[in-house]
Amino acid sequence: LGDGSIKWAQWLAAEGGDEAQADGMLAAEAVRLLEREYEKPFFISVGFHKPHDPFVAPKEYFDLYPPNEVQLNQDPQDRSPLSRYALPDSYDRFRSFNDQDRREFKRAYHACTSFVDAQVGKLLDVLDRKHLWDNTIVVLLGDHGYHLGEHGWWNKVTVFDIGARVPLVMWVPGREGMGAETETVVELLDLYPTLVGLAGLEPPHALQGKSLGPVLSEPMVDWEKPAFTQVLRSNVGMGYSVRLGNWRFTQWGKDGSGGLELNDVIRDKEGYYNHADDPKHSDRRERLFGLLKQRFPTISRAAVHESVSGNK
C-alpha cells in the first residue's frame, strides 16, 4: 500500500481455505481440544492474531467487501487542531496513500475481521454440539481499538476512544440480562476479578480491577468507575488518559506541557473536537485531572500548558 515504505501495510486475498492461515489452524486445534476434553472442567484461552497486520485472509472474506462499496472516512473541516502528541511521530507516513490505497486497507481490515469472526463461530459451534452453554462462561475481547483513516491515521497507539476502546462480549449461564448491550465504561483489568468471582473463588486483595458482576446482572447499573489508558510518545514521555461516563480527558506529559484534550466520546467518538480550553467545561476537566492524579500520583499540572493550537 502507498509507496511501499510501510512494510507492514500489506494485504493479500489468499487462495485456500481457513486452515491455510495460522488463525484457521489455531481454531481447528482449539475445536479438537474442546471436543476431546469437554466432559472435564476446562479453561481455554484462544488468542487469534487477526485482524492484525499484515492483512491476509482467504479470498472469500475479501469478496464480502467489494472495493467500490468501501466508504472512506472524511475528517470534518471544522475539527479542532490536533495536540502535538495525539498521534505518533510516524503520522506523515500515510500521506503517500491515495484513495485506492485507503479503500484496499479498509477492505482488508474488514476481511480479516470477518475471517476471525468465522473462527470464533467454530468454537461456539462446539458449545452447541456438546450442549455446554449451561455451564460455560464465554468472553470475547480485543486488546485495542484501531483507526481506519480518522485524523489521517491508519493504526493503533492512540488514546482517542476509537484507539483505546475494545470489544468485550460476555456470556454467563444463568444470569439475567444476557444479550443486552451497555454503555457502562469498564476496564480489561476488571476481567480477572470478574471471572474469579463467577467461579466462586475469593479474589486476591489489592486488585486494581473490579468485578463486573453488577453490570452483568443489570446493564444499566450506576457504575461510576473511571477507565485509564496510557500510551508512550517520544520527547514528552507518557500520555495519560481517563474515561468517565461520556467524557475522556488526556494529558500529555507528566506536567501537561505536551497538551490537554477533553472529548465528548458519545457525540464525538472520533475525538475531533477538543474542549480542554473551553471555560464551560473547566470543572469537568479538573475533576477528570483529579482522577488521573489519584491513579498516577507523579503527574502534575504545569502553570502554562500547551493549547490545542500548539501555542503557549
Language-model regions: role of each:
Residues 144-150, 156, 189-192, 197-265, ...:
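C-terminal cap/loop subdomain of S1 sulfatases and analogous C-terminal strand-loop tails that border
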Residues 174-177, 268-272:
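A short, flexible beta-alpha/helix-coil linker loop
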Residues 1-28, 32-185, 198-201, 205-206, ...:
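Active-site-proximal cap/lid insertion segments
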Residues 12-14, 235, 271-274:
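Short, local alpha-helical segments
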Residues 28, 273, 286:
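Alpha-helical elements of the RecA-like P-loop NTPase motor core of helicases
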